[in-house]
Amino acid sequence: MPRTKFIVDDPMTRNGVLVSSRAPLETILVRTNHVTGEIELDPKAVTDNPRVTFEVPIESLDTGIPLMNDVMRGDRWLDAAKQPAIRFTLGRVTSPAGTAALEEGKTLKVEGEGTLELRGVSRTVPVRAEVTLLGKNESTARRLPGEVLHVVARFELPLAAFAIDSHLAPQSLDKVAGTLQVEADLFASTDRPQVPEDMRQRLAAARKSLGQRLVGS
């Protein structure tokens, strides 16, 4: 299998990013299932200049609390009006140190660093990931077309590095962690899923409606 491009674009919005803040007085969990991007690598030499990018629209981030969502998206926090998306771009892989190959069905652990773009600020962050190649078969076809790559990536988001901590009110200091934990769980495929736009809209509306019912229950 030569150098291959995998597309992160699940029309069923089953990919996910979870951001957690665990402070002395409060735990906040922020989630989105709207993730798009690309992963390009050589399965026989994963560390040989892989290219990874993904982004999430800030408006899709959800705490489960409407008022908290409004605050989070405002100019004192993520400033969605001026910077509507958060982007991550892999810079380099530092581990494994030598050539490493992906074996179908086996998980490979990698470490590296990438650039996180947030609020108009770009910062380098260390990243750890688990990568699994899933060959094309009847089971994977029920999820996505083509070869499938499952990536679980984790990194930290220090608020001070993105000038967010300075906006926190004194009474918020025990409710928001200074460093947030981010986990992206993504399935990418060599073939782009073909779903009519009206179906995408119905799926998005159904997910939004379900989320609202769960919050109100």
Please state what every model-predicted region is.
Residues M1-S217:
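Low-complexity, acidic/polar, glycine-enriched regions of mature
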